[in-house]
Amino acid sequence: MNKQIQTEADELGFFGEYGGQYVPETLMPAIIELKKAYKEAKADPEFQRELEYYLSEYVGRATPLTYAASYTESLGGAKIYLKREDLNHTGAHKINNALGQALLAKRMGKKKLVAETGAGQHGVASATVAALFDMELVVFMGSEDIKRQQLNVFRMELLGAKVVAVEEGQGTLSDAVNKALQYWVSHVDDTHYLLGSALGPDPFPTIVRDFQSVIGKEIKSQILKKEGRLPDAIVACIGGGSNAIGTFYPFIKDDVALYGVEAAGQGEDTDKHALAIGKGSPGVLHGTKMYLIQDEGGQVQLAHSISAGLDYPGIGPEHSYYHDIGRVTFENASDTQAMNALINFTKHEGIIPAIESAHALSYVERLAPTMSKEDIIVVTISGRGDKDMETIRQYMAERGLAND
């Protein structure tokens, strides 16, 4: 295994050629302030203790690493373990990062938060920590996403957040990020931008990765306890890439195959997909250089996925770098493949995963049978499927897949 891999951003915020700080001059003071504050917090044992206290007492960590006996048997290959991020408070991995950044904002003396959300999971996690720490929160959410995720909008409002509909562009996550960045520029004195994925200008990709790395660190100690060795393969779904980078990061220098599963939407041969790595090319969006779905003229294209949490047109800079050096292998799953995996997995394990997580399971169903019964796969179940019930119900009804 190549030990020369760059695992931290350089002083300009780049991983290889990806990352950086492509932001208006007016935002640089805030970025510099954040970078300095984060560096200090990271080195402060008291900050780490406080973070660990809330992760344990409030979020409910550590989450289990569950052996999926029935699912393993049905696939007839490698042993499959599930990293249960669906069991966190609020039902997904998003809370790990929201909590960490809220503590950081509090430390910086910021009384207000602004966030973007797509599926609403990051919005709910942000609203949750804002309520916990008595902070104001404005959430920008695309008007299309608001229609798809009414329940999460209500949850955010119940928790005390103000949800602002974004009509511009296609009314999805990408447009919400634009609005949140604009808002931050004009409220920078008292507001922290609680970015939800491992992207945006440096130091955000590093901050989000560090707060999500609790996933991979736990996997490592748990699998060593259960199996006495590291897994052969680790699989996670990828939108912007925060659950995946948190899962992969502690294993980057180990001899473990890492698979990120992108959303192929209606198929990689259509223009309705979210394959930033699979069909994209490097470009700049939302303050960072990364792989993007764009046309020849560099216009960012609309990403599509049945899962609102994966339809982002980019993938974070660290993933972009790991792709280029061949450290992480990027696979994909279509809407249909993900939904079929979701239905199959649920029947075997009695766990209803988020549609995002089902993309990872779809690849596990292809990978496991090619491996031996001694091999070990860990797959991150990034969230639970409660938010997706209506989508799943519609999908099954349209295809006559009612329960027999």
From Swiss-Prot:
Superkingdom as given in the UniProt entry: Bacteria
Residue numbers carrying N6-(pyridoxal phosphate)lysine: 94
Residues annotated as transmembrane: none
Record InterPro entries: Trp_synth_b_CS, Trp_synth_beta, Trp_synth_beta/beta-like, TrpB-like_PALP, TrpB-like_PALP_sf
EC number(s) recorded for this UniProt protein: 4.2.1.20
Signal peptide: none
GO terms under cellular component: cytoplasm
Pathway(s) the chain acts in: Amino-acid biosynthesis; L-tryptophan biosynthesis; L-tryptophan from chorismate: step 5/5
GO molecular function: tryptophan synthase activity
Annotated keywords: Amino-acid biosynthesis, Aromatic amino acid biosynthesis, Lyase, Pyridoxal phosphate, Tryptophan biosynthesis
Subunit organization: Tetramer of two alpha and two beta chains.
Recorded family membership: Belongs to the TrpB family.
Protein name from the UniProt record: Tryptophan synthase beta chain
Phylogenetic lineage: Bacteria, Bacillati, Bacillota, Bacilli, Bacillales
UniProt gene name: trpB
